Amino acid sequence: VTLPTYDEVIGRGSVSELNYNEYILSLIKPEELNVLTVHAEVEGISCATMFGRFLKKARSKEIALVPLGTFLQENTPVEKSSIERGKIHGRDGWVSIQV
């Protein structure tokens, strides 16, 4: 995941529901893989209208949105990695972090 989730940035600094979409779009780096986690309970329910506007704005900027699975070919080996508990600024509690 390379982009912050809604709950990680909303209400922090100057990010509000009015400028959330623009904020996330400003973080996208065209030359890199950008990964945004979408939560069904947020973008799919309580913020569905806002998420719909995000999708339209992304398309108007010619930003391609695809599921991560499209980058995997059949039988692609997945490397093993270790994880540990860690903290991420703006996130309550601990999260699993790849080490």
Whereabouts are the PLM-identified features?
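Alpha-helical scaffold elements lining the catalytic groove of polysaccharide deacetylases
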Residues: 1-30
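C-terminal domain-boundary segment and adjacent tail
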Residues: 28-31, 35-99
